[in-house]
Every structure is written in structure tokens, then in C-alpha cells.
A protein has these predicted regions:
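P-loop NTP-binding core
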Residues: 1-202
């Protein structure tokens, strides 16, 4: 029996209602700025990259994953002036979109940090899929920003693993001196482990 073209398409293709679809404006690039050694310009790099992108009218989200919250204050947000932070997101108590703060730059938003993030490593240990908490949270803003810049914590713990599992690009600021290069080899080993087991897109 021959079916009308419209009837045939109805049988072959399912179009979900608009209420069930999520509009993606952008294919988002997620960039981690990471180095477990302090004082190498990690946060300065993350803030300036995010600010430059915003000045070029590129929708950008800066995520502060460092408990010192220097990236938060670096874009003009007073630390502690908000009720929730990235801490609440990574332990599953808040949606990422509910924590986003506007900055003075039209195209730059920030997810602020707080000192509470220090204790998140311990809380994450007991959670299922603890290495992917940030990656899953990012789905909440998928397609809204062209770039997401993540300022990683100065460590190689679970928070940094979360950052590396979420990113598809990594920038490693480094000083050309012995101890910085020694720490680089540890970071590269961690990156290879994440690429092998958690995030092949990194």
C-alpha cells in the first residue's frame, strides 16, 4: 500500500514538541586554565581571556573553581555578596544557571567561588559520578555561551579532575624555572589519565 508523503514522514520521523527541545545558540568551547602551582598567572590569564572575549562581544562565562575566589573579585564581584557559589553546584545543591552573576561587561557572566569550596573535595568523595559533577552541571547552560573559561584550583584533587573532565581545551600558564617544570610533568600525567578514562575530547 502506498502512503501519502506526509503520512510516510510521520511514521519515519519523530519531531518532539517545542517544549521538549532545548535551543542551542552556540557550540560552546570550554577552556580550562590550569596549573597546580600557585603564582604562575593562572587566574590572571583566565580573567583576561574571559574579559577579552567579552569585549569582542562574544558571550562568555567565567567559572571560578579556585577557593581563593580571585577570579570572582577580578571581574568586579564582591566575594561573599552572593548566596550561592560554584560550591553549591558541584555538590549538587544548585543549578549552574541559578548561580550565574552578571558583571559590568555586557557579554561576560561569572559563576563565583567561595571559601566553602575547600571542603567540597571531601564531600565529593561520597557522591556518585563525583568526577563528572561539573560536566553534568554545565548542561544547564549548554549553548548559551560561545566560550566557558574555567579557573582551576591550584591542586590536582577532585575539583581539578572535574574541570578537566568538563573541558575540551586546556591552557597551562607556566614559569620557566625548575620547580614549575617539575610540577608540569605531574599535571601532564593527570591530563593523560583524564583523556584515557574520563574525557577523550580534552
Amino acid at each position: 500500500m502506498l502512503l501519502p508523503i506526509a503520512g510516510l514522514l510521520d511514521k519515519l520521523v519523530y519531531f518532539p514538541p517545542l517544549s521538549q527541545t532545548k535551543m542551542k545558540l552556540f557550540d560552546t568551547k570550554i577552556i580550562a586554565v590550569s596549573n597546580q602551582k600557585g603564582g604562575v598567572g593562572k587566574t590572571t590569564s583566565a580573567v583576561n581571556i574571559a574579559a577579552y572575549l567579552a569585549v569582542t562581544e562574544t558571550p562568555t562565562l567565567l567559572i571560578d573553581m579556585d577557593p581563593q575566589a580571585n577570579a570572582t573579585s577580578g571581574v568586579g564581584i564582591e566575594v561573599g555578596s552572593y548566596k550561592q557559589s560554584i560550591y553549591d553546584v558541584v555538590i549538587g545543591k544548585a543549578k549552574l544557571s541559578d548561580v550565574v552573576q552578571k558583571t559590568d561587561l555586557e557579554f561576560l557572566d561569572v559563576v563565583p567561588s567561595s571559601a566553602q569550596l575547600v571542603g567540597a573535595e571531601i564531600e565529593l568523595v561520597s557522591l556518585f559520578s563525583r568526577e563528572r559533577m561539573l560536566k553534568e552541571a554545565l548542561e544547564d547552560v549548554e549553548g548559551k555561551y560561545k566560550y566557558i573559561i574555567i579557573d582551576s584550583p591550584p591542586s590536582l584533587g577532585l575539583l581539578t579532575i572535574n574541570v578537566l573532565t568538563s573541558a575540551n581545551t586546556i591552557i597551562i600558564p607556566i614559569q620557566c624555572e625548575y620547580y614549575a617544570l617539575e610540577g608540569l610533568s605531574q599535571l601532564l600525567n593527570t591530563i593523560r589519565m583524564v583523556q584515557k578514562h574520563l574525557n577523550k575530547e580534552l
